[in-house]
């Protein structure tokens, strides 16, 4: 309508005037670095929660995200974004930003690779050299293996980081064991716990679009590829078969990171004789959380499926392949 168009234009003009009236500062805004833009629902949920918190503090705050898919990040989150491996793009932003946020997620570990660990440590060191305050936010720490890697990690964090918030106590102990003492360290929680589930109507519509009864009885399984998983897959399938035959629950397999997880979830589903459903991750993390409210039980390897489930009080069981899963369940 005309009134809505006029109202939107007035809002735009007011935003321009408000931002123009702000005093010019030598350094301002936030640059965020994490494993974003890879299609992982857990990492996307972390980013959404961090951005919501920052915008609640100052809706005009300049925010940039280092992403594996900058175009998608700009489109989805309405923030500036540069490629995570383009130092010619992110170094100027480090020089402009007042705060550098490393996290959330398990960035400081070399289970993925020592190259990955060194990359995130290098970005922290660069941000510190550029004059940013450095915060590691909502992080999981470890495992960091190898004495040289542990000493190098402790040296960078002690010299370059101002504040660390952690999602569980196991990470605090890992930092203490490495000798990280200089930053102020607080155990809080994963940022994704702040996300609210989608409305009941939206969740019901999604169920119906996938030929699922919104009032049905379901057990969710969230698997991911991992070394030696094939040796234990039959036990997971037997569990799904048991809850189906004993409690009448339909197994629903969800790929939280579709490009990596879809195949293993399809394989597990194909080993069952009862009806099963295999779903890719939803782009809307809040819809994923809303789905979990309808599950009678959730069995997951993926950490953020466990976090989503706990945020809505859904019964859950973890298949721990990594200390971060064990740490969260203990916390």
Identify what each model region corresponds to.
Residues 1-20:
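A charged, aromatic-enriched C-terminal amphipathic alpha-helix characteristic of glycosyltransferases
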Residues 19-331:
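Active-site anion-handling motifs in enzyme catalytic cores
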């Amino acid at each position: 309508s005309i009134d809505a168009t006029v109202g939107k234009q007035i809002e735009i003009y007011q935003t321009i005037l408000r931002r123009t009236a702000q005093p010019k500062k030598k350094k301002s805004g936030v640059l965020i670095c994490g494993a974003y833009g890879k299609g992982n629902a857990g990492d996307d949920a972390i980013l959404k929660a961090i951005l919501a918190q920052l915008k609640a503090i100052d809706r005009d705050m300049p925010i940039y995200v280092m992403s594996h898919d900058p175009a998608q990040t700009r489109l989805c989150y309405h923030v500036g974004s540069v490629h995570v491996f383009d130092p010619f793009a992110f170094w100027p932003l480090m020089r402009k930003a007042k705060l550098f946020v490393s996290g959330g997620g398990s960035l400081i570990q070399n289970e993925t690779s020592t190259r990955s660990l060194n990359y995130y440590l290098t970005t922290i060191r660069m941000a510190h050299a550029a004059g940013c305050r450095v915060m590691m936010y909502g992080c999981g720490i470890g495992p960091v293996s190898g004495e040289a890697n542990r000493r190098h990690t402790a040296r960078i964090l002690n010299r370059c980081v101002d504040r660390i918030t952690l999602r569980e106590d196991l990470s605090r102990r890992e930092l203490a064991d490495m000798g990280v003492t200089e930053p102020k360290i607080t155990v809080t929680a994963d940022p994704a716990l702040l996300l609210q589930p989608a409305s009941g109507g939206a969740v019901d519509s999604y169920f119906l679009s996938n030929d699922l009864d919104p009032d049905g009885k379901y057990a969710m399984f969230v698997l991911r590829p991992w070394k030696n998983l094939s040796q234990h897959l039959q036990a997971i399938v037997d569990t799904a078969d048991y809850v189906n035959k004993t409690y009448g629950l339909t197994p629903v397999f969800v790929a939280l990171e579709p490009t990596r997880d879809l195949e293993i979830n399809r394989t597990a589903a194909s080993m069952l004789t009862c009806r099963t459903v295999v779903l890719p991750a939803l782009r809307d993390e809040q819809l994923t959380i809303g789905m979990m409210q309808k599950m009678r039980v959730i069995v997951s390897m993926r950490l953020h499926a466990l976090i989503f489930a706990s945020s809505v009080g859904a019964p859950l069981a973890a298949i721990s392949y990594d200390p971060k899963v064990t740490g969260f369940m203990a916390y």
